[in-house]
Amino acid sequence: MSTTSPQSPGFRVVARPKPAEYVPAIRPWLRPLLWGTFAGFALLGATGAYLAGVSLLNWLRPETLYTTPFTFWMFLAHGAIGLAGTLPFLLFGAAHWMTARRRPNRAAIRLGLLVFAAGVLVALTGIALFQFEGLPQLPSGTITRSVIYWAHVVLPVGAVALYVGHRRAGPRIKWGYGKAWGGVVGVTLVGMGALHGYDPRAAARKGSVEGEKYFHPSEARTADGKFIPAEALMHDEYCMKCHADIYRDHLHSAHKFSSFNNPAYTFSVNETREFGKKRDGDVRASRWCAGCHDPVVLFSGQFDNAETKFEDHPTGHAGITCVVCHSITNVHGPVGNAAYTIEEPQHYPFAYTTDAFLMWVNNQMVKAKPEFHKKTFLKPLHKSAEFCSTCHKVSLPVELNHYKDFLRGQNHYDSFILSGMGHGSRSFYFPERQKDNCASCHMPLKASGDFGAKDFDGSGRRTVHDHLFPAANTGLPALLKLDPRYSHMSDGWDRAIATHAEYLKDKKLRIDLFGVKGMRPDGSIDDSSLAVLRPDLPPLQPGSTYILETVIRTLNIGHHFSQGTVDSNEIWVEFTATDSDGRVIGRNGTTRDPDDAGPVDEWSHFVNVHMLDREGRRIDRRNPQDIFTPLYDKQIPPGAASVVHYKLAVPTDVKGPITLSVRLRYRKFDHLYMEYVHRGTGRPVPKLPVVDICADKVTLPVAGRSNRVEPQTSPIQPAWQRWNDYGIGCLLEGGVGAKRGNLRQAEVAFDKLLSLGANDAVWHGHANRARVLFELGRLGEAAAAVTASGTCDPPAPWWLRAWLSGLISAENATTAADLDAAAEQFARILDPANRPRDAAGVVTHDFGRDYVVLGRLGLTLFKRSLLEADGSPRQRAVLAGAVEAYQKALAVDPEDLPSHYGLSQCFAKLGGDATDEGPVGPATADAVRELVKALGAPGGRAATANQLAAAVTDLG
């Protein structure tokens, strides 16, 4: 409304509207929500800073795990605060928008919206990382999980910067509160860090008065020398939640049934325990068994209870649990006998709870932050062959047999290391690429939907490693299938038997009816009459006697066949000869009872070890305390062959063609052993599966008979390998390096390879001829054969030529130059710069761990030192090289006898006398003492180390 005053024409008075009342953006009723949001952010920032600091330390020093159970209480608090604060934050944001949306400062509004959006994204990414069931899962290691994780970490920092800009439109920020918060958080973080060094479990843990020695003569130990509660090691069902497929495989594995839940082992270990009670008055010697077979019983401190029947005790049925294997923190060295350190694993909160809600909380923490779980239960050592060596390499200690301090038992590890599949440079055959570890063969990848599965091989499919450990043990699942306690797992046992059987038959070995030789009237063998079977089919003469040469060859096996429990594994060849009427005219290797039941013909060719006790009796019931010496060892090295000779007398009245058939058969447990196991149980000896690993058959005509035989070819390709395998088998007859093999026959076989002219046949022929000629002492011819193996096309592998050349040069050396040349060849094989590589530059073979070559280098250098003046600097330098080579060999095999002897020779020469320059003194003696302790097994080498150190000091 306006009016014009009559006293002042031309002027207008305007009444302005009353200004609107100021409304603050933060209403009084919003302040509690704001303060709650600030408080939540402060707590989230504090716990988040702690968690980020731990993650940073883990990233900077991956060899150390800084995460502890305390970390997860902070993580749980962080998640709980975040979830609890999400709704107030959303309510505050919505209300604040309603009160401030019409403000003229549009930039402040936009920044506020960005702060709110960032907060919402932080909440959503946090919820996603918690892996709640029903929501899309983010498996560890995926790109999606990484993106969401980093968004959750970075967004709060960005939100703070945006908030500072947003607050420029309002009251000034009171930075004093922020500084106070920072100070409190900093002090708190320091206090939290101090808690990382304290393990509350240690306060209540008990141990033996013997300390670490309690576990001897097993080489196992616990991290603190104390016992581990049995329940901490018996937690397989906990693992099943995220690793269901692995759990099912392990549940039917020989590892799971390694202990008193294994009837065969139970019989043997109970006998060993009874033997110890009678001989020693206690069962301590049988701890040697428990380190590998009964870890839960041993580490919980119960094993020495001599009167406990562990076959009826829960701990006796635990076997090698998931936690046992995955709680091993260290391998002491490749000495076997359970040479590992185990600790009680640290868990996320509520790992042992039976409350459903708390169990759910625990599961969510594992899924949300799996790094601690992975670091705790999966370490680099688990991927090494040395990890497997702890229980798949065995020596019998004097505490067990009261015989001597060392007697070799099974040894998969050294066999693998020295094989062409592993790190050996001296094999007859080499794969295109060596295997990195035992798991390459025995833990194949299999498709899985487990939460813990991942794309291991880059194929795009999620897989896990097979924890059934496919190998050969078809006998144990067959026994357990008959046990009422485990009969409900029948389908699983059938699958386990089938898996092991298929694994055995999958190109692991082959058998070849290679040739036939005639016999002279005086009973001697006419080697010149050797006729190779197929494509030629020589007729057999009625009334004549023949020698049938059968070759067994190991193929895709990285260790001796069979290794393991070679005294009770029942592996044999069955040979049958029948005429056209089906009449059996020759047979060897059959079972006593029909349908593959009962004992095997004792005159069969067994591929095992015939072990004896002190009285010359066979070790026939897995009684290790009585093992004394082997009578024979017919195992077949990896990538090698064995020849079995059958004598066949052809009847004069034989009809039609004769069919010869052979098959290599496998039964896990010797029948006599099973008789012992089931004696007194009231149960019959069960029929165990017999697996036909490989077979061969050929039909030959009979001279003077009207019989037609169809053409036949051998399935073995390339055909030249038949001659090569036969030669290898003849060379190795009697043992490697025994010089009592069929060397003349081997030379003939390798000569034949040269005449065949096939590409690879020629270099094999030359190289293997060199091996034979070396054994025969014809060193000049051997050297010429090695040279020829390098000039053919293709040539023999350079490392094999270097080995043979070095061997011959060292053996034939007459000058220092000869020994230098030999040492140079050995060093060339071992030099990392010379490792063979593929076209992409990736190493395919690494021979640096071939301790036979290392030992030969040490021996050659020692011989070379003898040509220098005693005590001269040059001699000491050469001896130092020999010591280094021997020490490297002992780092791979601490029990290598030639290297120990070689070191003693070197130390004796280095010792000199008291007037020599640089005598061996106390410092060197201390170094030797520590060296021997380090190379040996814990508790088992200290006395030897002290004795050697004393001897070296005396030399000085």
Regions found by a protein language model. Give the residues of each.
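Residue-level recognition of tetratricopeptide repeat
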Residues: 719, 760-762, 794-798, 836, ...
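TPR alpha-solenoid repeat register
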Residues: 763-765, 797-801, 839, 853, ...
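Primarily the internal scaffold of c-type cytochrome electron-transfer domains
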Residues: 9-17, 141, 173-186, 197-230, ...
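Membrane-embedded alpha-helical bundles that constitute the cytochrome b-like, heme-associated redox core
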Residues: 2-207
